[in-house]
From Swiss-Prot:
Top-rank taxon, per record: Bacteria
Record-linked NCBIfam families: transcriptional regulator NrdR
Physiological role: Negatively regulates transcription of bacterial ribonucleotide reductase nrd genes and operons by binding to NrdR-boxes.
Cofactor note: Binds 1 zinc ion.
Name of the protein in question: Transcriptional repressor NrdR
Key words, A-Z: ATP-binding, DNA-binding, Metal-binding, Nucleotide-binding, Repressor, Transcription, Transcription regulation, Zinc, Zinc-finger
ZnF region ranges: unnamed: 3-34
Paired cysteines (S-S): none
Biological process per Gene Ontology, one example term: negative regulation of DNA-templated transcription
Entry's family note: Belongs to the NrdR family.
Keyword Transmembrane helix: no
UniProt GO MF annotations: ATP binding; DNA binding; zinc ion binding
Taxonomic source organism: Mycolicibacterium gilvum (strain PYR-GCK) (Mycobacterium gilvum (strain PYR-GCK))
Length: 154
């Protein structure tokens, strides 16, 4: 790696540590030419493939924005949204694929959101799954009730 100070083409790794809950590696480096130290952060790139075929980097902030809209007027704090976004990223990364279709990101949001706030879940699901009638909402509410009963038993 080039030194950012003198542009020397090589550097030595002095220390490496995991950061961001294991999603990145922070490396402390030293330049043999000028002797200065600098830090680099390495992350595995995770890309989302949209329906149009366009690829963009995965963004926790985008997940939070979408879920925050569904949570508008609900008692959901920023810490819960950040935790949900981390769960979504972990689920998407667990697929092992460097490129994930956008609909898989949406599916990864639904589970944690259902556990966080059922009303926000219904709002998000209605847009994500393109509900077009009251019957669509009724079916989803029945599925929520069934999930709640199964969760209560275990």
């Amino acid at each position: 790696m080039h030194c950012p100070f003198c542009r020397h083409p090589d550097s030595r790794v002095v220390d490496s540590r995991e950061t961001d809950e294991g999603q990145a590696i922070r490396r402390r480096r030293s330049c043999p030419e000028c002797g200065r130290r600098f830090t680099t952060v390495e992350t595995a790139v995770l890309a989302v493939v949209k329906r149009s075929g366009v690829t963009e980097p995965f963004s926790r902030e985008k997940v939070i924005r979408g879920v925050r809209r569904a949570c508008q007027g609900r008692q959901v704090d920023d810490d819960a949204l950040n935790k949900l976004a981390q769960q979504v990223e972990d689920a998407v990364r667990a697929t092992g694929s460097p490129e994930v279709p956008a609909n898989e990101v949406g599916l990864a949001i639904l589970g944690p959101l259902r556990d966080l706030d059922e009303v926000a879940y219904l709002r998000f699901a209605s847009v994500y799954r393109s509900f077009s009638s009251a019957e669509d909402f009724e079916r989803e509410i029945e599925a929520l009730r069934a999930h709640r009963e199964v969760s209560a038993r275990s």
